[in-house]
């Protein structure tokens, strides 16, 4: 009986290290900062993820009281991440430095840490978390932009398909309508070309009149045009306006 109890205690002690890492990981994920929690959590749709990010950032801002809580880069005695509470001025200086240089070299890191009274490792961890948040927000913005583009293209494709169906229906109803139609054109002529066109039209009209046996003569004094037939008979008199000659 004693041997069986010892075996039972031994089996429990051997199995506990296999279960402990899973519970420890869950606890670490629960106590992790918002940006690390979002990177390790399963991906959600863009709308849900943006709502979660906004809610977590608002909650973090209320908890920080104007400052911010960041990872210290080290671990405590129980293995949990230590939090670094930054003041409002420290957060502002770090944000300004991040806008100028998203990635710092060791010299810049040491200078900034000395200026803020922090360790270089703390500054490095803050920049890593800030880059992760920026990348996540940019991914959400790109996702929303591509989603709107996809919706616009889908609507445009639907409209074009509807137009194609309408054109096919019209073509089936009246197939000869499109064959006889000529595309509309707009002609613009300069005055010189118009004079040349009028001269050509007059020549064509005169040639047609000769073919019909009609001759056109212009009376200089009377200022009229007389159309005569081939046998010499007068068909009609057409008065014309005589322009005075310029000296």
UniProtKB/Swiss-Prot annotation:
It comes from the Eukaryota. Signal peptide: none annotated. It is found in: Nucleus. Keywords: DNA-binding, Homeobox, Nucleus, Transcription, Transcription regulation. The keyword Plastid does not apply. The keyword Transcription applies. GO terms for molecular function: DNA-binding transcription factor activity, RNA polymerase II-specific; sequence-specific DNA binding. Residues 137-182 are annotated as: Leucine-zipper. Residues 58-81 are annotated as: Disordered. InterPro entries: HD, HD-ZIP_Homeobox_LZ_Class_II, Homeobox_CS, Homeodomain-like_sf, HTH_motif, Leu_zip_homeo. Expressed in seedlings, roots, stems, leaf sheaths and blades and panicles. Residues 79-138 bind DNA. GO terms for cellular component: nucleus. Probable transcription factor. Belongs to the HD-ZIP homeobox family. Class II subfamily. This is Homeobox-leucine zipper protein HOX17. It comes from Oryza sativa subsp. indica.
């Amino acid at each position: 009986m004693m041997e069986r109890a010892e075996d039972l205690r031994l089996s429990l002690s051997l199995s506990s290290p296999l279960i402990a890492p899973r519970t420890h990981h869950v606890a670490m994920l629960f106590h992790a900062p918002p940006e690390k929690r979002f990177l390790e959590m399963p991906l959600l749709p863009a709308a849900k993820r943006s709502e979660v990010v906004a809610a977590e950032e608002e909650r973090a801002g209320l908890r920080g009281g104007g400052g911010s809580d960041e990872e210290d880069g080290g671990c405590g005695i129980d293995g949990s991440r230590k939090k670094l509470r930054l003041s409002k001025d420290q957060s502002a200086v770090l944000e300004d430095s991040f806008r100028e240089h998203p990635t710092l070299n060791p010299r810049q890191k040491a200078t900034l840490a000395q200026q803020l009274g922090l360790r270089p490792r703390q500054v490095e961890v803050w920049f890593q978390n800030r880059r992760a948040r920026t990348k996540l927000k940019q991914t959400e913005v790109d996702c929303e932009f591509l989603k709107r583009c996809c919706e616009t293209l889908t609507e445009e494709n639907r409209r074009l398909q509807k137009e194609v169906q309408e054109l096919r229906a019209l073509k089936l109803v009246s197939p000869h309508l499109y064959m006889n139609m000529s595309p509309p054109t707009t002609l613009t002529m300069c005055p010189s070309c118009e004079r040349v066109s009028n001269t050509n039209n007059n020549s064509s009209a005169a040639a047609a009149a000769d073919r019909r046996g009609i001759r056109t003569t212009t009376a200089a004094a009377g200022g009229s045009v007389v159309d005569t037939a081939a046998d010499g008979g007068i068909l009609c008199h057409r008065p014309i306006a005589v322009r005075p000659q310029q000296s």
